[in-house]
Amino acid sequence: MYDPKSLKAEEFICHEEIEDTLKYADENKDNLPLIREILDKARLCKGLSHREASVLLACEDPEILDEIYKLANEIKHKFYGNRIVMFAPLYLSNYCVNGCTYCPYHRQNHHIPRRKLTQEDVAKEVIALQDMGHKRLAIEAGEDPVNNPIEYILDCIKTIYSIQHKNGAIRRVNVNIAATTVENYRKLKEAGIGTYILFQETYHKESYEKLHPTGPKHNYAYHTEAMDRAMEGGIDDVGLGVLYGLEMYRYEFCGQLMHAEHLEAVHGVGPHTISVPRLKKADDIDPTKFDNGISDETFAKICALIRIAVPYTGMIISTRESQKVREQVINLGVSQISGASRTSVGGYAEEERPTDTEQFDVSDQRSLDEVVRWLMETDHIPSFCTACYREGRTGDRFMSLCKSGQIQNCCHPNALITLKEFLEDYASPETKAIGEKMIAQELENIPNEKTRSIAKGYVEKVAHGERDFRF
């Protein structure tokens, strides 16, 4: 029985409810009065239920699709303005005991070299990332209790935060590791992590168990209930994601929204972020062998509807996607992107060797400077801000500020201050020239006179060598 307040995976992600929802969506995909009613509700920026959003996803009317895209862009700007938060993944270890059939790190893949970074290696990677200009990382590691125990992860986090090379500093470490215990989540909280990220991969239980035939990840309930344990362990911000291409996209979309509704119902706080990765080629993984791949057009529609249905969430897209796709979905709701990513262990400090393994092939291979310049040329502010985490604006406090729109009073000036840091320390002359012009224009767009004056003062101080100012 479907119950969003239940702590049992098969009740808050109820297969029968998803099937009923998809049937309802099919029956109403051409019901224009209902669709207009749903769109009118969406314009209130309070979100949509999984059933309402599924009707919009099923609708194929071109005029409605145009309206969905326009509304997604409006909602994104209402909550996040024209800012795009920058981050990079940092792969610590590709040792893994699981048998995931879509990931090259699976245990049966014997021809890839296995590698685990030492703390000295971690420091080298962090320096390389700082020298690009990154301030925010998402650490990644395979599940292996012998090679990658929680103590190893904690040591890596400590090392990352300790490195300050020249003017560089990693100010926020997000963590994407396997589902674990409440006790271990408490340890991650104490280590000062930002968001705990865990991709569900697929919400379809039967498919999930086939795709994860061996290893601890085979346990669907333990994996699906991980966010509840994380929040019980004190982690304020959690990030959801499915791997589109493993199962029918409409099923996954519905399940993802049900998970968000569950977190809101039980904990009073929905997902801080939602990621939208698609299955991509990697080492011994051929995505064409999976039957549920989605087109760029469908992918864009999913992104737009996630923004409409969960307006407060940060939406993340990685370098799995091409520059063309990233540019489209940034205008449909995506608010965070990775830049200059390396998806192999040790990929930043060393030249990638042909024998190195990547978790997935990188489609957007531009440098961080090139990505920053591209964003500004498309009228977006690249933001390296991490202030909310360090000012305690997390969990329900962040959500209340975000839902009310007040978060922009902090985020807009903070984005400009951190962009100024990037321009002073890491940018090419061409990028710096474009950025200086953008900062001057955007400072004048800060509505509060006092905030605008303080922000201008901080930007001037950064120009004279001082760092790390924030609202």
Model regions: which residues?
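Radical SAM enzyme core and accessory elements
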Residues: M1-E37, K41, E327-S335, S341-F471
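An N-cap/entry alpha-helix motif that binds or orients negatively charged groups
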Residues: D40, L44-I84
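Canonical Radical SAM [4Fe-4S] cluster-binding loop centered on the CxxxCxxC motif
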Residues: Y80-D121
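Generic structural signal for well-ordered alpha-helices
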Residues: A88, V126, L154-Y161, Y185, ...
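Core AdoMet radical
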Residues: R107-A123, A128-A230, D236-L246, G268-S275, ...
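Conserved C-terminal portion of the radical SAM core fold
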Residues: A141, T195, Q200, A221-I285, ...
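Short glycine-enriched, charge-decorated loop/helix-capping segments at active-site entrances
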Residues: L211-K217, T288-N292, T357
